[in-house]
Amino acid sequence: MRAGTLWRVLALWLLSVAAWGQEDDDHADDYTQKLFTVSISGTRVVLTCPVEAEGGDIHWERDEKSLPNTKKELDLTDFSEMEHSGYYSCYVGTKNKENEHILYLKARVCEACMEVDLTTVASIVVADVCVTLGLLLLVYYWSKNRKAKCKPVTRGAGAGGRPRGQNKERPPPVPNPDYEPIRKGQRDLYSGLNQRGI
């Protein structure tokens, strides 16, 4: 199959999928226009019925019990999760399955709550990371400068416990006659070690 033909088939397929998806969206628009609107502010919850009242009152029910409100909005002040949670329904005229809209509501509210948007949360996180990195660099440079000002400590060497480097405080030890090196001109008992002829 040639590349030009492949592109034409792909374009035709994409157009048919887009047209098919648009038909489904037309039916979805009818459904999405009939959704409840829920507004929460502090301890106040307001439900808005998706039905338009054409000359009639809107009836509200909670868990199959009628509520006294006949307006489009149901205002629940001092909302309590235990008392006010449940199935809410609204309808115009007589109740039947075609004109009844049902919503299950379970909300948590508080008086002193504060809503924080995404930019505020992101700026708090960025500021926290910057402060942490600043403190890390401060401690690093402080410890580096402190280490440079300190005198080097001499540590004891292996078996003798003598310092490894030249010690300026005491002179080198006096040579012990038991361990003096063998003189070149003198021929002693051990002066010929490791000098075997091979």
Curated annotation (Swiss-Prot):
Residues 142-198 are cytoplasmic. Pfam families: Ig_5, ITAM. The chain crosses the membrane at residues 121-141. Keywords: Adaptive immunity, Cell membrane, Disulfide bond, Immunity, Immunoglobulin domain, Membrane, Phosphoprotein, Receptor, Signal, Transmembrane, Transmembrane helix. Disulfide bonds join C49-C90. GO terms for cellular component: alpha-beta T cell receptor complex; external side of plasma membrane. The modification Phosphotyrosine is found at Y179, Y190. The TCR-CD3 complex is composed of a CD3D/CD3E and a CD3G/CD3E heterodimers that preferentially associate with TCRalpha and TCRbeta, respectively, to form TCRalpha/CD3E/CD3G and TCRbeta/CD3G/CD3E trimers. In turn, the hexamer interacts with CD3Z homodimer to form the TCR-CD3 complex. Alternatively, TCRalpha and TCRbeta can be replaced by TCRgamma and TCRdelta. Interacts with CD6. Interacts (via Proline-rich sequence) with NCK1; the interaction is ligand dependent but independent of tyrosine kinase activation. This is T-cell surface glycoprotein CD3 epsilon chain. It comes from Oryctolagus cuniculus (Rabbit).
